């Protein structure tokens, strides 16, 4: 489930939405049929990704507690906020997947549906925020020029995340009681996807500028073993950055597609095909997991800022 692909469906037939004023506005599979069609793949998807996100949360908390101050000594706040956001995202995703995955239960309470939908959206915001803060740490640590200075600071990213989360809460609550206000959900989904796409592109731009700076500094590398070793370390970091950029760009492009396509609030379909849903959501969960993994890898490979 993503923040833009859930639906509360009680019946298994094609009854009208009007009987269920609190139903979700986005199309989803007919869960009674979908679970039978997907079989063991449904179970593997739910419990597999629940375990992955639980590990992401556990690793984030463990790293905060056991490794604080080990790296990025001048940017402990950045580091703590980034890993805290990952911990929240991993925890919320795993809870929702284990409790009521994609709001697929036929006997879900209204409060449970609303909690799951909002929690999933908050997790999406936290993953995107962590992805952004990791880029900020890299840009500041390597002193790479990238965009206006007032946009390259932790308070700005935290404020942006909180604004997105508050708008998410507002839009979900309004649409919950007034489904005709679905444009609010649409704006929320497009904003999240666009934010992620911009950050993904910035990873590539920052990486390209770091590479340019590295090549400029390698003129005398053969005179300095230390410089040569540092250049190799930076090359590995750049490779990770480009992979993170690629996976992020694909993920947020898929998110944008689902927001404006047949998975979105303006789709004319009520139900979508089980296998179409499974492919899209499995792809997104995989890419989100890889983004988190690459954040951790970049943390270990990034240069110290002493």
Place the predicted regions along the sequence by residue:
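Extracellular/lumenal N-termini and interhelical loops of multi-pass eukaryotic membrane proteins
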Residues: 1-34, 267, 271-273
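Alpha-helical multi-pass membrane domain signature
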Residues: 33-306
């Amino acid at each position: 489930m993503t923040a833009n692909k859930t639906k509360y469906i009680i019946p298994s037939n094609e009854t009208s939405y009007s009987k269920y004023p609190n139903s979700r506005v986005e199309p989803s599979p007919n869960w009674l049929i979908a679970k039978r069609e997907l079989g063991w793949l449904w179970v593997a998807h739910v419990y597999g990704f629940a375990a992955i996100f639980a590990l992401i949360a556990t690793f984030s908390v463990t790293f905060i507690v056991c490794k604080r101050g080990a790296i990025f000594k001048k940017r402990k706040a950045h580091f703590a906020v980034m890993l805290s956001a990952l911990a929240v995202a991993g925890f919320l995703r795993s809870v929702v997947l284990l409790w009521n995955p994609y709001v697929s239960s036929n006997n879900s309470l209204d409060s449970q549906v609303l909690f799951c939908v909002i929690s999933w959206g908050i997790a999406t915001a936290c993953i995107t925020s962590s992805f952004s803060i990791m880029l900020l740490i890299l840009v500041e640590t390597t002193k790479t020029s990238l965009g206006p200075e007032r946009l390259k600071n932790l308070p700005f990213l935290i404020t942006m995340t909180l604004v997105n989360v508050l708008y998410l809460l507002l839009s979900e609550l309004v649409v919950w009681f007034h489904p005709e206000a679905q444009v609010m959900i649409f704006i929320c989904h497009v904003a999240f996807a666009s934010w992620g796409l911009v950050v993904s592109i910035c990873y590539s731009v920052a990486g390209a500028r770091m590479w340019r700076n590295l090549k400029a500094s390698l003129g005398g590398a053969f005179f300095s073993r230390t410089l040569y070793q540092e250049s190799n370390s930076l090359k590995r970091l750049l490779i990770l950055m480009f992979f993170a950029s690629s996976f992020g760009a694909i993920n947020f492009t898929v998110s944008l597609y689902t927001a404006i396509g047949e998975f979105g609030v303006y789709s004319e379909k009520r139900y979508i095909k089980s296998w179409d849903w499974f492919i899209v959501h499995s792809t997104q969960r995989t890419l989100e997991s890889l983004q988190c993994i690459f954040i951790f890898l970049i943390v270990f490979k990034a240069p110290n800022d002493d």
